[in-house]
Amino acid sequence: MIRAPLRAALLAALMAAAWTPLGLPTPAYAQLPSLGDGGGLTLGAERRLGERIARELYRDPSYIDDPVLSDYIQSLWDPLLAAARQRGDLGAELEERFAWRILLSRDRSVNAFAVPGGWLGLHLGLLAVTQSRDEVASVLAHELSHITQRHISRMVAQDSRQTPWVVGAMILGAIAASRSPDAANALITGGQALAVQNQLNFSRDMEREADRVGFGVLSQAGFEPLGFVTMFEKLQQAARLNDTGAYPYLRTHPLTTERISDMRARVPIGPTTAAPADVLHAVMAARARVLSAGGVDTLPDDRNRLL
């Protein structure tokens, strides 16, 4: 389960955010925004909220600073950022104000989550189950799109009176899912109980929007679009065969046949083939599996062995 000190610190940070001026709209503005509306938290307010959460994530014992894996993930992240910029999804002000950093966790569960202000959490367990760089990039593109489309801010704009609890439940639920599915369910359920019914529908719309925008970013960045589909299918199959809580990503990003079909329909028509064997990715996935095991703190840099 999520460690008590971390949980307490996160709750304290979120409660502090509730009482700190964050540039929230007045209750009269508490209406469901259009999908193009980023109203809610200002850029600066969202960055400050994210910094509070990120500080605690950096302090958590599961946080890992492995230069080899960090460099590899960054090599996938940078082209996605460039593609989002070229497409107009990432404006100059948003790029300047947000952090755009990825935090790695040695957690063995399959999970990734966006944090306010441009941080993204990635579990080594997710990297370990992927078979290609394109599959990893598809997850990063999806989460990046949650950030560029200001989904957290728009959740806030939906009902500003419930902001601290809804945002807190969403963030803590995503993080707690990596430790205890039961705890995550309680947090998410609590957040939903505080929200209006429209918020659940809006969340589904957010997932579809992150799929569509993320798919475009993935393709623009030069990755194989089919990676989006194969990653979705991998997660869906895992959910059917294994409901032990090892795939918390599915709890916060529920897959539907509609979403998978939509992504497959976007893949360019023509013969499709599996991604060619990628030795570097295979090494990185293996490294992630080893480092996510208990008792292993560091590994030598084995990239030169591939040269």
Features from the language model and the residues they span:
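Hydrophobic or amphipathic, alpha-helical segments that drive membrane association/targeting
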Residues: 2-4, 13-113, 195-196, 238-240
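Catalytic Zn2+-binding segment of zinc metalloproteases
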Residues: 134, 144-161, 179
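Solvent-exposed coil/turn segments that connect beta secondary-structure elements
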Residues: 78-79, 105-109, 117-119, 125-127, ...
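Short pre-active-site segment immediately N-terminal to the catalytic Zn-binding motif
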Residues: 121-138
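Acidic/histidine metal-binding catalytic segments
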Residues: 156-168, 183-187, 222-232
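Extracytoplasmic and endomembrane cell-envelope/extracellular-matrix remodeling and assembly machinery
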Residues: 36-40, 51, 63, 71, ...
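Membrane-active amphipathic alpha-helices enriched in small hydrophobic residues
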Residues: 164-179, 186-195
